[in-house]
Amino acid sequence: MKRILPLLIASVVSVALLAQNSFYIYKLDGSIEQYLVDEVERISFEAPEVDPDQPIEPDQPIEPEQPIEPEPQVAVLTFEDDDAKFPAYTLDYCGVDVEKWSDIIPAADQQYYGGSTLIYADWGNPDGAPYTWTDAGNTGLTHTFPYNWGTYDFAGGGMVISNHYVSLEELENVGTGGMYNYQLSILGEQTDNTFAFAYCDSKVNSDAKIELAFEDGVARQLNKMKVVMGALPIYSIINGSDFSEAYDDDDYLKLVITGYAEDGSTQQVEIMLADGQNPETWVVDWTEVDLSSLGKVTKIAFYLDEAQQISYDGGNTIYYKTPIYFAIDDLEVKL
């Protein structure tokens, strides 16, 4: 009479047919059992009995599944046409339709004071409209020239889109009389790279700060950006200019970035752009700056601090002597 062969599932490794009339059962304890096929009607696999009041102890500890953290979403302000996502707008004061970043770059031969109507159209006009740009659809940051000296022009400070380069040799050839023809330039060979080029008001403690703000007013984390000195301050640090002297060991040029939280509190990041007459300290190439210590901000403000200062009215108003220009690029925002 054939029998039913009950086997505990947890005790069996495998069942192998050895020949047409027999098979082996390999068990976890290392034993092997042989049966004739003719003796067995069927094999019945059974689960072991479990005491419902006794918790099951697993052979290996079961690690709880860790939640998968989503990758943080970031957006980068590159100022490149391929990355422009903002809706088209018009700068009415100069009749320029803006669909991409390069639409608001002053021409290379119009970098001097008063040269481009994009950034000098409203000189002396208190009701004039300011140069403005937006990165809507990407980082959400926007910038507008500050109102200063009775105008919204670049002479009062601001951040303009540029892609202009100049060599130090060319600046030395034209000297202080011609260097402002390269006012919106950084040092280097001409490339297709586009960036934001800034001028800070030369008045010490000026209220006309250069600001980048989130258009919707929501605070976000700024991760990092790149920064470099403008070509004119580098030339002036080395050679002096009509208004400044070549740097001594005690001179410096420092960029200060202030972040404003939703509650109005502030944090600052300082970047030494030039420390004395030591070229190794000069930020003449694009340099990455960590902005994470600012925390979540609704806006940031830039200003430059410099050792060389002068007063023309008996000390009532103090001005920086070195041309204070810098550029930024690749500003990363955590969304």
Locate predicted features.
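Bacterial Sec-dependent N-terminal signal peptides
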Residues: M1-Y24, P61-I68
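N-terminal targeting signals for Sec/Tat export/insertion, comprising classic cleavable signal peptides
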Residues: K27-E49, T90-E99
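Ser/Thr/Gly/Pro-rich low-complexity, disordered linker/stalk segments of secreted
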Residues: P48-E71
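N-terminal targeting leaders for non-cytosolic proteins
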Residues: E71-A208, G217
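Terminal, low-complexity interaction segments
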Residues: L77-D81, D249-L335
